[in-house]
Amino acid sequence: MDAIYEVHGLTKRYGRTAALNGVDFAVTPGKLVGLLGPNGSGKTTLMKISAGLLQPTAGSVIIDKVPVGVFTKAVTSYLPDRMALPTEFTADDAVSLYADFFTDFDKVKANAMLADLHIGGRDKIGSMSKGTQEKMQLCLTMSRAARLYLLDEPLGGVDPAARDYILSTILHNYSEDAALMLSTHLIGDIEKVLDEVILLQDGKVLRQAAVDELREETGESVDAYLREVYKC
């Protein structure tokens, strides 16, 4: 099967510091991939370049056979690692904005997910907790019929009780002809839903592997394996 998301020799430098250094990988449709690594390993930089928000120093990102640009923004649904909407917006304002910007946005689905999470349409973003803001942004992101979903730390600010709902939302709201990549530090919570992992360190790919293959090879969970790989 042809890859839907390809990264070739991707490098991003800030002065003498390389946030990414020759990153290569490919992801096929139907895969849910964990992008894993310690702080400063390049996860957010990779996602921002893939979402068209940063320019690389070298290399390329191909999404649905097209280099990152105007077209790929239309087929990529990106969840940033922090609130990207004005704090004076209400949840209804946010839904309307997404409906205006993205032709693949399902307003009915978004409102249903927000209601499930007890987020009212008139609730202002500025009055929401960090966890509620993240849940709202996830609902918006997953209400698009995208080809590629990029979720940067979707579980970072939510309480443990909400994580199962969020994982269920992720699993049930992307199709088999799409791919989804999420970055997280909470591998123990999401390992059960991942198909593959990509391990980053110091801006380089240490490894890309199927989760089942990694478990069989090491005889331990991915969480335990990562603790060994990234131990100080």
Predicted features by range, described:
Residues Q208-A209:
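ABC ATPase "signature
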Residues A51:
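Helix-to-loop junction immediately C-terminal to a conserved catalytic motif
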Residues Y149-E153:
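Catalytic Walker B motif of ABC-type/P-loop ATPase nucleotide-binding domains
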Residues L36-P38:
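The feature captures the beta-strand-to-loop junction immediately N-terminal to the Walker
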Residues R82-Q137:
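ABC-family P-loop ATPase nucleotide-binding domains
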Residues A58-T72:
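Conserved ABC transporter NBD signature motif
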